[in-house]
């Protein structure tokens, strides 16, 4: 991932593995595919070389539907077509030669995309649902040690820690990790 502006965790992934070559790295992803999405889109694509290319990023594969151009026949994934991500995050839909879509010249793709701009600082800070005990965002920091056996030594929220509320939440979490440890916070510089 090289879209550091929209997918801020990619900054940490890149720095950890490509610049400093250290591990492990534990990430808390707050981009929720049930909550942070754009409205459904339908577009028609020309079949070229037995495939179509959906030149959009952030497509949720479980919500990708392929139909004939008129939208009257919906084709089956892995039977009539195979969809896969490319290295740049777009999607290629290959038509199965023995599938029902084999003679189509154009296909209609309907899909839902992630919307990173819908993430808020409240999502990053997170919460605890008292009814279900489900934790989100920075509230998950205390789960890292018991679940994985690693003590989070550096806490950061790339693209978010310049927000005062996020900075305070990071400081609070770093001061007592699993009631046993402390960590340090790496803050963004607001430019």
Sequence positions of predicted segments:
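Surface-exposed assembly/interface segments
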Residues: 1-191
């Amino acid at each position: 991932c090289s879209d550091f502006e929209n997918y801020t965790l990619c900054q940490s992934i890149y720095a950890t593995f490509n610049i400093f070559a250290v591990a492990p790295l534990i990430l808390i992803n707050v981009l929720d595919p049930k909550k942070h999405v754009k409205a459904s889109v339908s577009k028609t694509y020309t079949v070229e070389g037995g495939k179509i290319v959906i030149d959009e990023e952030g497509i949720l594969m479980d919500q990708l539907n392929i139909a004939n151009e008129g939208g009257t026949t919906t084709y089956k994934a892995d039977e009539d077509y195979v969809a896969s991500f490319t290295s740049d995050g777009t999607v290629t839909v290959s038509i199965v030669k023995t599938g029902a879509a084999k003679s189509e010249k154009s296909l209609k793709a309907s899909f839902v995309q992630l919307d990173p701009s819908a993430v808020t600082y409240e999502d990053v800070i997170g919460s605890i649902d008292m009814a279900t005990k489900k934790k989100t965002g920075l509230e998950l920091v205390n789960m890292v040690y018991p679940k994985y056996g690693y003590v989070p030594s550096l806490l950061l929220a790339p693209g978010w820690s310049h927000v005062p509320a996020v900075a305070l939440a990071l400081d609070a979490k770093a001061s007592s990790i699993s009631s046993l440890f402390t960590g340090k916070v790496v803050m963004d510089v607001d430019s």
